[in-house]
């Protein structure tokens, strides 16, 4: 059985500790996101590290299994739509502005290295969402059984922050479907409480 290295580190964006586990010692960095209601250890419990043991042992791939917080935001029906979208955006910023740089450090990545993302169910949504909004940071995404239409969870995508989190709302075949609305959403950074907002980048 492949043994991973466990980490529990403080997230300034989320104001809490977040857990993740790393498998392998080198290779292409892959950020793995859990399914709906899942945790970082689900990938190990379902045998994924063992399934790619050869790639991990040969230093071709390094797997980083992140934790999720869907139950607190996206799936929390007790919160209003806007607040759920705000929490989802904070999680996105955690993945892209905090965890991704940490992954590249642990990977001893060369300058310019980009991360791959992978996920199942809502994890696929997070994986693809990260790739679409931060293509300079993520090389590609593998979404398995993904849920990309978030209206089933929080209704229409009329709110600017909701739009910012919904791939089917902000993209069409040839690019961004509603550029003015998305531009407005990207300007709305006051809800993300980090000391260096410029680190977030823009879509």
What is each residue range found by the language model?
Residues 1-191, 195, 199:
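Non-catalytic cap/lid and distal C-terminal segments of serine-dependent acyl enzymes
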